[in-house]
Amino acid sequence: MLAGALCFCIAFTSLAPVAFSQKKKAPVEATPPPVNEEFKFGKVDLDLLEQVDLLDRRFERDGLVLEDEATNAYLARIGNSLVPKGLTLEHVKWKFRALRDPQPNAFALPNGSIYVTTGLMSLLDNESQLAAVIAHELTHVMRRHTYMFNRSNRKKFLTMNIMSAIGAYAPGGIVGAVITVVTTIAPFIVIATIFGYSRDLEREADLKGIDMMISAEYPPEEMVSVMKLLNKDIEGEEVRLFYNDHPALQERINYLSSYLGARADKVTPQMELNREKAAYFRKMEPLMRHDIQLAINTGRFRSAVYVAQRLVDFHPDSENVFWLAEAYRTLGPRAAQLTEKELTNSAKKDAAKKREKRTVEEEDRELLATPAGQENSKAHQQKAEELYQQALGLENPAPTAHRGLGMLYEKSGRTADAVAEYEKYAELAPNAIDHDRIQKRIETLRRPPP
């Protein structure tokens, strides 16, 4: 499973699959992974199936599935193009959906539900990379990996305290909601998806995923590109999930590159990949903006800056400028990038302990008490202000830029300027969902000090 993002972290628009301008000899035999035809369902398997069916319903009920028809249709088109034609599997109904989670992750449930988080899709460069993620997850379902892993480990899991096993991983917001749902309904899934399956099963999913990509005429070297993207540690998280375990990711890069051989850079011309990247970004732009807000809401401020900058680089004179301003405003006194020292295992452990004990506001106060924090805060406020002003200078400026300036000025003590920006926002967006809250902020700021 391509891991790294979502609450439970499970192990990677309408464009046609990239077709080669001319057929090239595949670096490996382009055959889909064989179905585990010897697999027979037993009671323990049917019990697990019942649990994961309930998980699907809970994800929908609790608002964790992204309600965007175009995005989910896009995922379904890619997924269905990878599934071998005519394939039928007992107790499998293919579903491909996006999950509202800013952590990069993807996972497959054994009933055929494939989930990719908004956090992962926001990091990818093109459709072929998304196909690589889905192909990996499809293999887990087709080879019945979840059932086999459950059969081999369920007795051990029965003696485990699942929450203590993931104790250091205690996210809030959307991410915490997913963890809660999964641990309540199917605790085994948490272990499998956070830590991945056995090395042999994950390797099989990687290599057979490449074969599936070739069969669907996706450039298979993009499987390696996905691993390289995920190998970038933006948040410095201490818990090693399947998709952010960097030593393991490097090992996967090595054996995938070896599997592909020396043809990795020759299968698809770079210009064709660049065109595909542009098409992918056009399709994913709304989703990536949504993911920036999720990242801000869950305290993943560096990820918000990273994704917003990707959007601005792709489409500079657009609403994306506002989102980059929001990301810098909320980044506050934090450094935009972690140092090598902060990315060491010991530093990550210390940071995880601190996150458990303090709120974002407390972290802000701590950092603002240091010269570095004060310097970062000043630089990021200035950067955010410039970006908000730039957003307001666009042909169709978003009123939310006035709200952002109001929040920025209020925090820095510029009360009169904050009121003016809030009033402008209220005037331009009278039907905004936060209109009443903004009016109350205006009233509060206008009151004379006691």
Which role fits each region the language model picked out?
Residues 23-171, 191-194, 209-246, 250, ...:
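Peri-catalytic and regulatory segments of divalent metal-dependent proteins
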Residues 323, 404, 438-441:
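Canonical tetratricopeptide repeat
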Residues 173-184:
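Hydrophobic alpha-helical transmembrane segments
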Residues 315-316, 396, 430-433:
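Short coil turns that delineate tetratricopeptide repeat
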Residues 9-18:
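C-terminal segment of classical bacterial N-terminal signal peptides
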Residues 286, 319-320, 400, 434-437:
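Start-of-helix register in tetratricopeptide repeats
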Residues 1-5:
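Bacterial N-terminal signal peptides that target proteins for export
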Residues 347, 415-433, 443:
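TPR/TPR-like (Sel1-like) alpha-helical repeat modules
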